[in-house]
A protein has these predicted regions:
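Residue(s) in the substrate-gating loop at a strand-loop-helix junction
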Residues: 142
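A glycine-rich helix->loop->beta "capping" turn
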Residues: 53-56, 76-87, 95
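Active-site helix of classical SDR
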Residues: 122, 158
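Substrate-binding pocket helix/loop in short-chain dehydrogenase/reductase
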Residues: 98-99, 103-109
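The beta1-alpha1 cofactor-binding region of Rossmann-like NAD(H)/NADP(H)-dependent oxidoreductases
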Residues: 40-41, 60-72, 104
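Conserved glycine-rich cofactor-binding loop
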Residues: 8, 15-17
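SDR active-site lid
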Residues: 174-244
Length: 276
């Protein structure tokens, strides 16, 4: 198992939630941190927490959809720390709405952040990770990268894409003999503001959906999620399921095959009747 002391870790979406918790846990484990977010207020909060721990930190505002800016950022991080060992492509947004009433621009936005943001981060940092001789790509998908549910087609598409991209990358690194490990992360319901901050079509009762998520679905704290993720990274796991719900739902999908679709549609309609 690998440790984190002396490693340089990049964390996107580090201004809140899982990203912030990952940065803090990595700092406590002896890593140096390059953190970024579009939320500068949250980013500053994370930076202060890391400095209080005593970790070397570089904090920058970064929109993961801006490829050119990401390229410059990767070079700046390498120049600042001298190396890069790990990248946690964590930045993401949520969206709710049936395809029939969802506009193209909303689907594109979700794909830009949740999929292309991951691709951008992976591509621009991969040469530095290979050069380090001890690299690791950690891409955050979702339980919605394991199965689909109504009202989440755009998010499902992005998270399924992250899963496929990352699993292919892991095999490519192994076949090429590159010193880069690759892990896909599938969080279940985490106690963050992702649903509260999401966008949605007009027919979605966002307040009710948020209440349902907070009360019935958000079972794991970001801090617990971070510990689970980092334990998976230490063990070089190909896939990390975060939370008891993620483990249970993954098992259901494996056991039922495509039959899960009817089951989940029924459950979703009863749990969130106002969402459609």
């Amino acid at each position: 198992m690998q440790g984190f002391a002396g490693k340089v870790a990049v964390v996107t979406g580090a201004g809140s939630g899982i990203g912030q918790a990952l940065a803090v846990e990595l700092a406590r484990s002896g890593a140096s941190l390059a953190i970024s977010d579009v939320n500068t207020e949250g980013l500053a909060d994370t930076e202060e927490r890391l400095k209080a721990i005593g970790a070397p930190v570089k904090a920058d505002r970064l929109d993961v959809t801006e490829r050119g800016a990401f390229e410059l950022y990767a070079d700046a991080v390498k120049e600042h720390f001298g190396k890069v060992n790990q990248i946690y492509n964590n930045a993401g947004i949520a969206f709710a709405g049936d395809i029939e009433v969802t506009e193209f621009k909303d689907i594109e936005k979700v794909m830009d952040v949740d999929f292309w943001g991951v691709v951008n981060g992976t591509k621009v940092f991969l040469p530095h990770l290979i050069e380090s001789g001890d690299g690791h790509v950690i891409n955050v998908s979702s339980i919605f990268g394991l199965f689909a549910v109504p009202g989440q087609a755009a998010y499902n598409a992005a998270k399924f894409a992250v899963r496929g991209f990352t699993e292919a990358l892991r095999q490519e690194m192994e076949l090429a003999g590159h010193p880069v490990k690759v892990t896909t992360v599938h969080p279940g319901g985490i106690k963050t503001n992702i649903v509260r901050n999401m966008t949605a079509v007009d027919s979605v009762d966002k307040d009710q959906l948020t209440k349902t998520f907070d009360k019935k679905l958000a079972n794991t704290t970001p801090e617990k999620a971070a510990r689970i993720i980092l334990e998976g990274v230490r063990k070089n796991k190909a896939r990390v399921l975060v939370g008891p719900d993620a483990t249970a739902l993954d098992l259901i999908v494996r056991l039922t095959g495509s039959g899960y679709q009817r089951l989940f549609s029924t459950v979703m309609s009863r749990m969130v009747p106002e969402a459609h």
